[in-house]
């Protein structure tokens, strides 16, 4: 066959038929890589998860769900969820483009969550804590009656067990579909936190992107120490609403964690990879010193009591020896 005939036959041949991808193959392909919304760089998803869902190129903190937050903060096999049975109802029979009841059902199916917060207790670097993690995927992390009840019960449990409380905040505010029932959660959670504080117990909220509305106006700003992630949007009313009300241009960094740190509304901005270690250090510093006393029949000349500080505390030595008098 001549070269001319070969090219002629090739042109007549039908192009190969591309087989469409199955939904499973397409899902795997879509999940292999994640595009940074800030710089646009594609990163292998497993590498991104290994870096706490922080872009390796620009340092942008990608939004993470509540399950990932728990995995990042709580020691393996120590997480014990509580009050998982609580589910929202539709007392107002609210309906916009779809009924609130249908919206709840669809969101529960999409996220595999009962509502916008997970609560429980576990160990953070060996330290027992009570933890609440809000999930923005569930109706924008909005605070309804179930979110308020779960957080309130978590704080009451922590008060009873004398545990520090950490709440990861990510919310658009109160849930309008529940009306006054959602707004009253602000006062209810604040009251539970006051009882917790009166017992000299530690509460640390961590403000992530975004933390706005009724959450900001209540428990997000009531911490003994308030931490925030870099470049998180934190505020009450929206930027456009404030500009239209005041009729003036706001600073470019307005309602960011850096702006709030500069004006004294948050105590520290902590990058996500350092969050667990920072929380462990702060909780350890708040823990009391526990004296280890010798047995009653021990030789007092050979045994020295020690004051033990948790291994994660900011101390030069992990154990501080105290010499006995005489």
Swiss-Prot record:
Q: Where are the zinc fingers (C4-type)?
A: 36-58
What is this protein's function? Answer: Component of the acetyl coenzyme A carboxylase (ACC) complex. Biotin carboxylase (BC) catalyzes the carboxylation of biotin on its carrier protein (BCCP) and then the CO(2) group is transferred by the transcarboxylase to acetyl-CoA to form malonyl-CoA.
Q: Which family does it belong to?
A: Belongs to the AccD/PCCB family.
The record's annotation in Gene3D superfamilies points to: 2-enoyl-CoA Hydratase, Chain A, domain 1
Q: Which GO terms describe its biological process?
A: fatty acid biosynthetic process; malonyl-CoA biosynthetic process
* Domain of life of the organism encoding this protein: Bacteria
Protein species of origin: Synechocystis sp. (strain ATCC 27184 / PCC 6803 / Kazusa)
Query: Is the keyword RNA-binding assigned to this protein?
Result: no
Coiled coil location? none
- UniProt xrefs under Pfam families: Carboxyl_trans, Zn_ribbon_ACC
Pathway given in the UniProt record: Lipid metabolism; malonyl-CoA biosynthesis; malonyl-CoA from acetyl-CoA: step 1/1
Name of protein: Acetyl-coenzyme A carboxylase carboxyl transferase subunit beta
- Chief location of this protein within or outside the cell: cytoplasm
User: What is the protein's quaternary organization?
Assistant: Acetyl-CoA carboxylase is a heterohexamer composed of biotin carboxyl carrier protein (AccB), biotin carboxylase (AccC) and two subunits each of ACCase subunit alpha (AccA) and ACCase subunit beta (AccD).
Query: Which HAMAP family does its entry note?
Result: AcetylCoA_CT_beta
Reaction(s) this enzyme catalyzes, per UniProt: N(6)-carboxybiotinyl-L-lysyl-[protein] + acetyl-CoA = N(6)-biotinyl-L-lysyl-[protein] + malonyl-CoA
| Cofactor or coenzyme needed | Zn(2+)
Sorted alphabetically, which keywords does the UniProt record give? Answer: ATP-binding, Cytoplasm, Fatty acid biosynthesis, Fatty acid metabolism, Lipid biosynthesis, Lipid metabolism, Metal-binding, Nucleotide-binding, Transferase, Zinc, Zinc-finger
Q: Which residues bind Zn(2+)?
A: 36, 39, 55, 58
Q: Any idea where this protein resides?
A: Cytoplasm
Q: Name one GO cellular component term.
A: acetyl-CoA carboxylase complex
Q: Name one GO molecular function term.
A: carboxyl- or carbamoyltransferase activity
Instruction: Identify the coding gene.
Output: accD
Q: What class of enzyme is it?
A: transferase
